[in-house]
Amino acid sequence: MIDFMDYIQLTFSDATHWNRDNSYTALTDTANALLDFSIPERLRVHLSSLSTPQFATTYTLGTVGLIDGSISYLFSTLPLESTPSRSTLIPLRRLVPGYRQIHPPLAPESPNESRHAEPNERSEKALQSWRKETMLHATLHLPPPTTLNGLFLRRISPTTQLSLAVCSTQATPLSKSTPQASILTQLSHDTGKYSAEFLFSTDNALLGFKGLWNFGPDPRHAATAQRPRTASQSVSLLSAGGEMYYSPLSSVVGLSTGLRFTTLPAASESTHSSSSTHPAQSPISTFPYTLTLTLTPLTGSLSTTYSLLASPNLAFSSRFGFNVYSWESEMVAGCELWRRKKKRHASTLSDKDDLSWAKRKMGLLPPLPPSPVKGTSASAVTPAGEQKESDSVIKLRVDQSLNVRLLWEGRVKDLLVSAGVGLGPSLPSIGGTTYGWTGVGVSVLYST
């Protein structure tokens, strides 16, 4: 489960219409969410609040063995008025990373397009999509030696975003050296067809570049940009990218490349369209899935992942890694299972009332709410008038060494609780290798 501040940052990105999926950094996000999730450490309590639409605070306290904590503040020039901030109202799927459904890339809206549009086509949301919005975030970790993390995020243009991350650690009392500090600058450019990221870090003067290219029609052309919005022609997306790092001070070089093939929402809707007069002719399975292949030539590491969304509440993922130099391999498998609770709609009667359908025909009862639009997120409404909401999720992962992680995240009253355990073989002893607990933790979040 992500922190409250991370949730606000994701909301800021969505409000400014920044596509987080069109980046080489997010190439393996789905597999990482299903296989590389972490369990809470010890007992941690998070108290958060979105006091105003532009200001948020978070206080964190960790206990059991070692007492530590942090204080976080966030300010946004863009008011997040419609953002659910209470822990009882925040959708659980917004806080728990899982299978990510990739959508067709769209070209960012430019100011010229908004100016030449008709007056009735102009909306405040469209104008805010290219405004130079800014977000400031700072976190102070306690106790001493304290660490200060800061983030400055600004939308420079419809296709460009600037990010400055600062990390400063207080020096020990006996040390006469200056406090350790580093600044990471990242300039991101996204056109829909491709994305590029330029990085510079003051730590060893590290320079970096990341790029991602999407095969298929160019969304920047007006003729092709409207197709995904109307007919949803594309059912799959193939992306290729890479990254490179170099430090002139330490002579460190890093290089990696990767591919991603994923189904788009149109592939999942082929089942519904097949019953119409124009059946779908898509050879792709209706189950959403994502395939990735990453290669690090310098270290000889090769990794492949396969993630499948078997149902709206069940997802599977697997990863196989191999090193051509050391002949070492890695196999990891994981899954997540969502549990939904059913709430009776106010306009429906109990199951014992068999005449409710007749009363609706006569106008004695209000009609049932319409079925939801395809592609809705966590909550849905059944034809019987029952509203389904995500209540909890269970995540499980296991590797070839029988290291097991089990995580449960859900809502308990007004609290968001995350509890996990880790099992695995311990260090070899005289009696042989033993199998036991490797970690246990509980995290509690309450926000207003």
Curated annotation (Swiss-Prot):
UniProt feature, compositional bias: Basic and acidic residues: 112-126
Q: Where in the cell is it found?
A: Mitochondrion outer membrane
Disulfide partners: none
Q: Which gene encodes it?
A: MDM10
Q: Which family does it belong to?
A: Belongs to the MDM10 family.
Protein source organism: Coccidioides immitis (strain RS) (Valley fever fungus)
* Bilayer disposition of the protein: Multi-pass membrane protein
Q: Where is this region: Disordered?
A: 101-126, 366-386
Q: What is known of its domains?
A: Lacks alpha-helical transmembrane segments, suggesting that it resides in the membrane via beta-sheet conformations similar to those predicted for other outer membrane proteins and porin.
Quaternary structure, per UniProt, is:
Component of the ER-mitochondria encounter structure (ERMES) or MDM complex, composed of MMM1, MDM10, MDM12 and MDM34. Associates with the mitochondrial outer membrane sorting assembly machinery SAM(core) complex.
| Entry superkingdom | Eukaryota
Return the GO cellular component terms, semicolon-separated. Answer: ERMES complex; SAM complex
Q: What is this protein for, i.e. what is its function?
A: Component of the ERMES/MDM complex, which serves as a molecular tether to connect the endoplasmic reticulum and mitochondria. Components of this complex are involved in the control of mitochondrial shape and protein biogenesis and may function in phospholipid exchange. MDM10 is involved in the late assembly steps of the general translocase of the mitochondrial outer membrane (TOM complex). Functions in the TOM40-specific route of the assembly of outer membrane beta-barrel proteins, including the association of TOM40 with the receptor TOM22 and small TOM proteins.
Protein's recorded name = Mitochondrial distribution and morphology protein 10
GO biological process terms on file: establishment of mitochondrion localization; mitochondrial genome maintenance; mitochondrial outer membrane translocase complex assembly; mitochondrion-endoplasmic reticulum membrane tethering; phospholipid transport; protein insertion into mitochondrial outer membrane
Q: Which UniProt keywords apply?
A: Membrane, Mitochondrion, Mitochondrion outer membrane, Transmembrane, Transmembrane beta strand
